[in-house]
Amino acid sequence: LEDLELVALNVLDEEGWDTFTSTYNSRFAKLIDTFPGTPSDEKAFESEKKMFETFKWGMAYVCPRGIGATAWTGSEKAQTQRLRRFYLLGQTLDGMRVWDIRRAVQSLRAIGGLGETKLWIQAHRDMAVDALYASIFEDGISRLDLHDMPVTHNGTVKDSASAAAPMLNVLKYLDLPQAAALAAQKTKLVIYAKDKAAWDWTSTTLKNLGKHKQLQLRDPVGTKDKP
């Protein structure tokens, strides 16, 4: 482990979990009894294998609560009731997922040989939001790669379906562009987004603080060559 140049912590949502299991199913399904019966993606596995052979990188994966092996079952009504219980505790599901990600970071640091290894975090969609908040409270994260991340918690906007998962009272103080600026004070932030203008507040603020190099706005993966 001491030879690794970096470790990338991948925070998985359900789509990410499906990709993970199909990639590694043919090699590790017998070792991990929580793998679903998804078809194996040999092409994806060979791509991962080539990456490991080329770079001294380690990959870690975490499913925050309610995802993958810990996904809750039951009717839609039962799922709604379960989410309401978090509110009774003064929390939301994704608020607690932020804590899960923080604990994953702390657990990686506790592994012998990884205490000082460069740490990246990668996440998509709502897990990108949760990873962003988690990074604000944890030190020693070198880089955040956030894909397809919502730009607001405000569910009353025109495209309300694209709003981020709720966090109690967060909009009293900030929204995601402000949270991104906070995170970029501590770690390099790479956001993959079609609408780069949505992050103008973040980029302008960081420029005014002399930290504009902390933020990169990139095209979504796989769209570079598309018209």
Feature annotation, model-predicted:
Residues 171, 197-227:
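C-terminal catalytic histidine-bearing segment of alpha/beta-hydrolase fold enzymes
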Residues 188-196:
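Conserved strand-to-loop "acid loop" that flanks and positions the catalytic carboxylate
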Residues 4-111, 115-118, 151-161:
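Cap/lid segment of the alpha/beta-hydrolase catalytic domain
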Residues 57, 119, 142, 212-218:
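Short, conserved active-site loop motifs that form the nucleotide-linked donor/cofactor pocket
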Residues 104-174, 179-182:
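Primarily recognizes the serine-hydrolase "nucleophile elbow" in alpha/beta-hydrolase
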Residues 62, 147, 192:
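The conserved SAM/SAH-binding core of class I Rossmann-like methyltransferase domains
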Residues 185-189, 211-212:
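A short helix->loop->beta-strand "cap" motif at the edges of active sites that frequently abuts
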